[in-house]
Amino acid sequence: MFMNRWLFSTNHKDIGTLYLLFGAWAGMVGTGLSLLIRAELGQPGTLIGDDQVYNVLVTAHAFVMIFFMVMPIMIGGFGNWLVPLMIGAPDMAFPRMNNMSFWLLPPSFLLLMASSMVEAGAGTGWTVYPPLAGNLAHAGASVDLTIFSLHLAGVSSILGAINFITTIINMKPPAMTQYQTPLFVWSVLVTAVLLLLSLPVLAAGITMLLTDRNLNTTFFDPAGGGDPILYQHLFWFFGHPEVYILILPGFGMISHIVTYYSGKKEPFGYMGMVWAMVSIGFLGFIVWAHHMFTVGMDVDTRAYFTSATMIIAIPTGVKVFSWLATLHGGNIKWSPALMWALGFIFLFTVGGLTGIVLANSSLDIVLHDTYYVVAHFHYVLSMGAVFAIMGGFVHWFPLFSGYTLNTTWAKIHFMIMFVGVNLTFFPQHFLGLSGMPRRYSDYPDAYTTWNTISSMGSFISLTAVMLMIFIIWEAFTSKREVLAVDLTSTNLEWLNGCPPPYHTFEEPAFVNPKWS
């Protein structure tokens, strides 16, 4: 019975729960890696004593957080749980493929861990650029294991993407148009299309790297007529859509949270929100070389990528101001979920502004590979994606579990986390502006103060993570059951009770076609 339910599951709710648990666990691993990094950088001089090991930590931290924490939780966890409920579908379109998508992740994670256990580990950075990732600078199986890990995670995501696209397009009630689906459903749809179009390019790139390493091909080796810059183009053609994949489901969740706790029945500017997400998805594919301003592109190429990158700020601004407009005039309920959402809006905007700075190719030549870039993407990930995940978690936890969190503890948790992440990453802007480079385990004494403060912030965030574990434990032991949920008329996922029955919508949902 246990095996049938959890190993061979075809139920979107159970698979969503598996994704959430796996992502939470991987998040702990990724947090551990980040704390080792910050411990090393807490003061000048060496702690770990081996720069290869330091770079392995940095690489593993990135891979774990991206592929095994943010994506499984946002797309696999929230996506699986909420999309079928929100469109009135009995399950996902391909329930067994859904199960396979999940079970490809633990082996993938195992391969990534194995890569750091053999030889010297993969100290390449998450970009895995050759020639550093080639078989001279990284002899041994480490990088090969990392590549296989990425292949499995990629297959998992591609299958999941096919599943979500099919489900969202095909499994709505006949009377429901695409423009009647909630914004979270749209965000998952756009995310799935991005995954489907970008991951095969990554697969091609890392497969060529694999053959360069093992079969003497020279795709990325100038000695045989190859070009390492080709790898960078292939990688970033995936890598840039990937960062939008990481944030788009968060956009969808924030729209729901802001609308709900503003007491509104719908978000401000639904169509604008939808097309902003679609625009972001499209533009995400035509700006990749802004990660490569320092490789010596023509000035006109740099001008194009600078301009195109800045254009993304427009649909993003549409979303930010629509969230603020949704809040405007609302009957605001100061719940922990809304606090996460407001934190998201502010900090994501700050991260977006530093992104506009980096979009300027002339400035980026100077700032590339400094801590300014680290600060930028951690503002949009560690305070964008993660805040969205936390907001979504405290908002939908009663739906998933049937129990309510202790609101006071949840607010305290938010405050500690808010202080921790800002103390960690705000000083890194200063470090970058004064020229401290990324991916080094040591630094000149001049950078000591801000690094020490940054490392202190990371340990404050650690206490927040530990408090979160306590809060979840407290909810499950106190067993405060959900009595009623407001605004179910425009929040369909709550309609079946908390938690919903194992099978929902066993007969087709009724949709009033006169809805406008």
From Swiss-Prot:
Fe(II)-heme a binds at H61, H378. Residues 1-11, 87-94, 171-182, 262-269, 328-335, 401-406, 479-516 are mitochondrial matrix. Na(+) binds at E40, G45, S441. GO terms for cellular component: mitochondrial inner membrane; respiratory chain complex IV. Heme a3 binds at H376. PROSITE patterns: COX1, COX1_CUB. The keyword Isomerase does not apply. The chain crosses the membrane at residues 12-40, 51-86, 95-117, 141-170, 183-212, 228-261, 270-286, 299-327, 336-357, 371-400, 407-433, 447-478. Cu cation binds at H240, H290, H291. Its cofactor is heme; Cu cation. Binds 2 heme A groups non-covalently per subunit. Binds a copper B center. It is a multi-pass membrane protein. It catalyses: 4 Fe(II)-[cytochrome c] + O2 + 8 H(+)(in) = 4 Fe(III)-[cytochrome c] + 2 H2O + 4 H(+)(out). Component of the cytochrome c oxidase (complex IV, CIV), a multisubunit enzyme composed of 14 subunits. The complex is composed of a catalytic core of 3 subunits MT-CO1, MT-CO2 and MT-CO3, encoded in the mitochondrial DNA, and 11 supernumerary subunits COX4I, COX5A, COX5B, COX6A, COX6B, COX6C, COX7A, COX7B, COX7C, COX8 and NDUFA4, which are encoded in the nuclear genome. This is Cytochrome c oxidase subunit 1. It comes from Balaenoptera borealis (Sei whale). The gene is MT-CO1.
